[in-house]
């Protein structure tokens, strides 16, 4: 009977019930959903489809024929252990009651009791209310028909009313004839253990969000075996399509199958004892939709094995070899790359780097019953009163862990239990003279304490915090002090160590890990590859926010030194362990860092006090959750004592805990922990102490500094001082490495000028800027060089060496090259290569014109390009740096538009151009903001520009010559400028190419004018300073003081160089000579041996902003008003900048590049390390000087693949994308 024929009435239990249920399902709060179902038991919610169906809220025990054992089996066998399923209710169909469940991922599922299969219904409860049960054959396969009056929206009715109106039957009469088809259930149970192991084995692969991520993971782990605990095949050896032997014909067959099925990525080949040759082994592939395919070289057919990786791991090869009833297992995981196989966290495809979001406990969605107080030592002291017993019981406080837990203070007898505190004094965790005092019960905030279930917290007379497991009566140390317990709560209480949190709570507590497929994460289960990665990236740091202000630094065994003697670490590596880094709080001294070790099982261990302790199951978990398994589990550690290896349990935790939390005493002897190698530390390890006066204690600056540098209270301080803040001299000296004096060898500058010079130079060293409009121009540099401030004790006559060093380094960086930096010369070369390619394509477009278009041109296209010009372009001469060539192709542009378009605008332009010739003005000029020295520039003649170029082209050119637009369009493999014109496609293509050629060549010529203008500025400065240097050196040689410069090798090359620089026509070579001037100048003893002690002291005073002078009786204390932490930049590189520069500079060879004649010989600096072209996703090729423009054309898709012509392109090895082959560049 239809609902519309019945008048069903009933009192809705709560008008906001549906909104409440939607909110609970959206937050996936399964415990609250169970409470909701219990409150609204036997109330029914109408659903839109199937018709006349109602969702009856009921617990599992009230579903007829649905036993607790059935639910546990389903939960266990069908990925429910990942979802943590919760029963919402049931839907009645004829003679059956079908359970509807919700998972921890908010998805809705349907459990078919007849086939014992879990079906995916929709993504969330809101979709379930809007659309009902669609897409499953369990209830109906018909499409819904919505008619007016049939469904009036979701509403509640009681089961009793619906039964009285014959809408629903009694639930106890249903499911009587259901017979479970448990085909193969015993086999499934036997495979479950292997299945869970394979989930962890394939976890990294399952987290991939796209085929590109899968391909990158496989390429990084080629040759790695993934275990398959299933029949037929025993392992999967990862390999790319190139590394898996295929053969030409078989590869073609695979491509044909891709065209028929979908695009796939090869995962590797399957191993079995019967396959001896790799060429006969079948391969496993994954498709764009996430499906897993089997490809055999005999049948040459892609056979689907599963809808997703999770299904394949559960089903195995059952579909291929036999039918054991597995084909419906794993249907719930239908989406590719969205959830990991462990179901813990989503994978975000848009993220490009690993980011740890700091933990913020204030973000919890607290209910109204949450206590307003946080547990604190002062709160506990107030509860004790005058004695050692709690005199004010019942006070409830929040604790840090687990989330939504509180601590109710009180003695045992306050909670009506027969336990006593003194009963636990016998514990072996306490010393003979130690005793315990009560604190209270820890329990969930929504209920009162359960004395026989909840843990009870106590603290000892020595400060340790103890927790009693009231279920097992075991005692555990959970913190070294009450302050630590305030910070970490019950983190180290074993029953709570594996506390299951819903995704939102876990994200709030541990923070959210967004992984963009970082290489070290992809290699976390590949120990040999991880060793290579650590060796290449030694010194790289990662933040670990499971603890406050904590970091992990990659380093290998050769990068650290153990203070207790040699041989200890080597024993670890002999036992299949590898050192991958160190960790500590960021402000800890280098010798307080603990080594992190990876085992053969890829678990993470910490090495402290001659033993290793397991802290995490994987590197990702370590970054996300810190020391997840440390101290609170009954694990075993390996301990090395001399030459004897034995096992001990994790009981000695005091030193380790203090080290990790920065609680080591101030006056401590040197700890026996990891430290940096001796050759990387300063030998003098004395302290510089900054005294803080009483009136400065509440200063915001002082409070800020003491967050980073721990204050020390010293009794011998004067009465006016409160405490001192120590900073090691090694830390300050390492900070000095971030100056121009130490990094670039530039000496004598005052700290203010030194900092300015360092900032300007280091921006180019680290490629901070991208376009010429973003960095300082030559005229500003000239003013800076003239205004540099020098130290008072620095001889004025050697200031020219400092200025030459700054001038040479900056001029070379901005105009030409430090390997692959984006300089002016870079853009000239980049765009001239592109223009050359466009000209060749323009010539090919001319040949493709129709007969009518060719006739319309009247032979103009054939006679215009002479053979001389073609030869010039073929040889890549200096044609793109000539203004006459630009005017020539501009006139060609106007004539082509007049002949092929013929509109009024084109004819008018052609007539005016013929009348006025080169004096013709297109209409306006533009003043380029980033190059003011060249004044206004006349824009080329552009006709029929498309949006947005007709409006914004002038502003783009004024800003950065449109370089950002040009590079962006080239990266997208299309022309920078498009046209809007009503002509045939072949004419439009021809005119578009010609317009872009004019635009590109205009930019090239403008940049070339800027290069010459800036060369003039730098050249004038250079000749002036070189003249001063020659005079100073000649004077030193004549005086002969201290025997310095007595050898003519210093002066003669400088004199020759001065004469060469002044020769006509050699101005373009002066930067090459500037390097010689630097080498000679840096060898001058007065400059080389300059005492930097005054500079160092002034550097500290300058950066610390020290204003007050210290008294005579406090010579070791420097008083200051303003302390600023974090200003030191540590130079971790082994060599300075000048040493690396000397390795980069190559000699200029006449035929190295033919078109360097008209620019400068120094363009070869740039050409020696031309930027690799593109984003790396186009077959990985790169451009080098000897490459032809065909390489660019190939990248843009205008040419076919160049197979054997190694002269024009080359492939970059997979492990070093984007590197420059054959040249030693910047690291």
From Swiss-Prot:
What InterPro entries does its record include?
UL27-like_protein_herpesevirus (IPR010302), US22-like (IPR003360)
Q: Which domain of life is it from?
A: Viruses
- Which protein family is named in the record? Belongs to the herpesviridae US22 family.
Protein name according to UniProt: Protein U7
Q: Which organism is it from?
A: Human herpesvirus 6A (strain Uganda-1102)
């Amino acid at each position: 009977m239809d609902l519309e024929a019945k008048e069903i009435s009933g009192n809705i239990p709560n008008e906001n019930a549906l909104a409440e249920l939607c909110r609970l399902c959206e937050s996936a709060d399964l415990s609250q959903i169970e409470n909701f179902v219990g409150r609204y038991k036997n109330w029914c919610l109408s659903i839109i489809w199937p018709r006349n169906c109602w969702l009856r809220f009921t617990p599992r025990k009230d579903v007829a024929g649905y036993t607790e054992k059935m639910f546990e089996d389903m939960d266990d066998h069908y990925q429910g252990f990942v979802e943590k399923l919760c029963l919402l209710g049931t839907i009645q169909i004829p003679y059956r009651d079908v359970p509807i469940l919700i998972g921890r991922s908010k998805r809705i599922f349907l459990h078919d009791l007849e086939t014992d299969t879990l079906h995916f219904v929709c993504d969330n409860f809101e979709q379930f209310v809007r659309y009902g049960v669609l897409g499953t054959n369990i209830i109906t396969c018909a499409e819904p028909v919505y008619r007016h009056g049939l469904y009036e929206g979701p509403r509640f009715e009681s089961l009793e009313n619906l039964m009285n109106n014959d809408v629903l039957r009694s639930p106890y009469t249903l499911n009587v004839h259901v017979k479970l088809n448990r085909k193969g259930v015993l086999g499934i149970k036997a495979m479950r253990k292997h299945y869970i192991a394979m989930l962890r084995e394939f976890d990294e692969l399952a987290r991939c969000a796209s085929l590109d991520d899968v391909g990158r993971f496989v390429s990084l782990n080629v040759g790695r075996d993934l275990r398959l605990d299933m029949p037929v095949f025993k392992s999967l050896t990862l390999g790319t399509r190139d590394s898996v032997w295929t053969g030409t014909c078989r590869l073609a067959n695979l491509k044909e199958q891709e065209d028929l099925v979908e695009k796939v990525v090869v995962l590797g080949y399957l191993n079995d004892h019967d396959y001896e040759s790799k060429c006969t082994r079948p391969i496993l592939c994954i498709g764009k939709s996430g499906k897993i395919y089997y490809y055999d070289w005999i049948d040459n057919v892609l056979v689907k094995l599963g809808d997703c990786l999770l299904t394949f791991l559960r089903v195995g090869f059952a579909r291929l070899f036999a039918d054991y009833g597995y084909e419906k297992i794993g249907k719930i995981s239908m989406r590719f790359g969205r959830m990991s196989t462990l179901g813990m966290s989503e994978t975000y495809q848009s993220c490009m780097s690993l980011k740890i979001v700091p933990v913020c406990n204030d973000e919890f969605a607290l209910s109204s019953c949450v206590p307003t107080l946080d547990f604190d030592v002062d709160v506990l002291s107030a509860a004790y009163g005058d004695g050692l017993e709690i005199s004010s019981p019942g006070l409830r406080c929040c604790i840090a862990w687990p989330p939504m837990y509180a601590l109710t203070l009180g003695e045992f007898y306050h909670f009506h239990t027969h336990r006593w505190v003194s009963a636990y004094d016998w514990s072996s965790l306490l010393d003979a003279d130690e005793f315990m005092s009560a604190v209270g019960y820890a329990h969930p905030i929504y209920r009162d304490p359960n004395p026989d279930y909840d843990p009870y917290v106590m603290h000892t007379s020595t400060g340790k915090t103890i927790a009693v497991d009231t279920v097992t009566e075991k005692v555990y140390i959970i913190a070294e002090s009450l302050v630590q317990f305030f910070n970490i709560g019950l983190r180290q209480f074993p029953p709570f160590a594996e506390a299951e949190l819903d995704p939102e709570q876990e994200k709030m507590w541990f923070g959210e890990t967004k992984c963009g497929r970082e290489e070290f994460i992809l290699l976390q289960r590949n120990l040999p590859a991880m060793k290579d990665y650590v060796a290449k990236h030694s010194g790289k740091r990662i933040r670990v926010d499971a603890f406050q202000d904590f970091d992990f630094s990659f380093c290998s065994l050769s990068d650290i030194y153990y203070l207790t003697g040699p041989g200890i670490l080597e024993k670890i590596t002999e036992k299949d362990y590898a050192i991958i880094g160190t960790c500590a709080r960021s402000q800890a001294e280098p010798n307080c860092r603990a080594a992190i070790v990876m085992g053969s099982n890829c678990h993470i261990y910490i090495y402290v006090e001659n033993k290793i302790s397991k802290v995490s199951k994987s590197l990702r978990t370590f970054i996300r959750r810190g020391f997840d398994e440390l101290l609170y589990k009954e694990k075993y550690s390996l301990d090395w004592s001399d030459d004897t290896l034995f096992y001990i349990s994790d009981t000695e935790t005091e030193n380790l805990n203090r080290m990790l939390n920065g609680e080591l005493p101030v006056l401590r002897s040197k700890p026996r922990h990891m430290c940096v190698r001796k050759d990387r530390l300063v030998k003098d390890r004395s302290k510089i102490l900054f005294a803080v006066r009483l009136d400065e204690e509440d200063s915001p600056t002082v409070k800020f500094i003491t967050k980073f540098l721990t204050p020390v209270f010293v009794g011998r301080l004067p009465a006016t001082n409160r405490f001192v803040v120590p900073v090691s001299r090694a830390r300050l000296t390492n900070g000095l490495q971030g100056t121009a004096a130490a990094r670039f060898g530039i000496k004598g500058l005052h700290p203010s000028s030194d900092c300015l010079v360092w900032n300007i130079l280091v921006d180019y060293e680290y490629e901070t800027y991208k376009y010429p409009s973003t960095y300082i121009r030559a005229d500003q540099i000239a003013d800076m060089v003239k205004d540099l401030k020098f130290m008072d004790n620095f001889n004025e006559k050697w200031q020219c060496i400092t200025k030459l060093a700054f001038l040479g380094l900056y001029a070379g960086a901005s105009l030409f090259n430090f390997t692959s930096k984006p300089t002016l010369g870079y853009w000239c070369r980049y765009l001239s290569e592109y223009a050359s390619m466009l000209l060749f394509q323009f010539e090919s477009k001319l040949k493709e014109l129709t007969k009518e278009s060719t006739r319309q041109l009247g032979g103009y296209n054939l006679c215009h390009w002479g053979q001389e010009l073609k030869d010039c372009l073929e040889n890549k001469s200096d044609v793109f740096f000539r203004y006459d060539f630009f005017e020539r192709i501009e006139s060609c542009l106007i004539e082509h538009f007049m002949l092929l378009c013929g509109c009024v605008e084109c004819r008018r332009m052609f007539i005016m151009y013929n009348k006025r010739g080169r004096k013709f003005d297109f209409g306006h000029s533009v003043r380029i903001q980033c190059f003011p020295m060249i004044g206004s520039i006349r824009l080329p003649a552009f006709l029929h520009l498309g949006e947005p170029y007709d409006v914004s082209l002038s502003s783009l050119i004024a800003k950065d010559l449109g370089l950002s637009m040009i590079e962006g369009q080239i990266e997208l493999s299309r022309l920078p400028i498009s046209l809007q014109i009503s002509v045939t496609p072949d004419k439009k293509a021809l005119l578009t190419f010609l317009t872009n050629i004019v635009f590109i060549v205009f930019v090239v010529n403008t940049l070339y004018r800027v290069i010459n203008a800036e060369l003039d500025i730098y050249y004038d400065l250079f000749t002036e300073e070189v003249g001063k240097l020659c005079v100073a050196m000649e004077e030193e040689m004549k005086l002969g003081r201290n025997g310095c410069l007595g050898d003519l090798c210093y002066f003669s090359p400088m004199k020759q160089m001065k004469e060469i620089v002044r020769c006509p026509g050699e101005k373009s070579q002066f930067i090459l000579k500037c390097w010689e001037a630097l080498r000679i100048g840096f060898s001058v003893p007065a400059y080389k041996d300059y005492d930097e002690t005054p500079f160092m002291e002034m550097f500290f005073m300058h950066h610390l902003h020290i204003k007050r002078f210290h008294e005579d009786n406090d010579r070791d204390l420097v008083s200051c008003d303003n302390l600023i932490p974090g200003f030191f930049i540590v130079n971790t590189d082994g060599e300075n900048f000048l040493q690396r520069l000397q390795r980069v500079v190559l000699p200029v060879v006449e035929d190295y590049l033919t078109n360097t004649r008209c620019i400068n010989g120094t363009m070869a600096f740039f050409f020696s390390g031309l930027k690799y072209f593109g984003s790396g996703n186009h077959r990985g090729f790169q451009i080098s000087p000897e490459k032809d423009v065909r390489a660019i054309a190939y990248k843009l898709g205008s040419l076919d693949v160049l197979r054997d012509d190694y002269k024009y392109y080359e492939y970059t090895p997979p492990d070093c994308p984007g590197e420059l082959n054959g040249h030693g560049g910047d690291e």
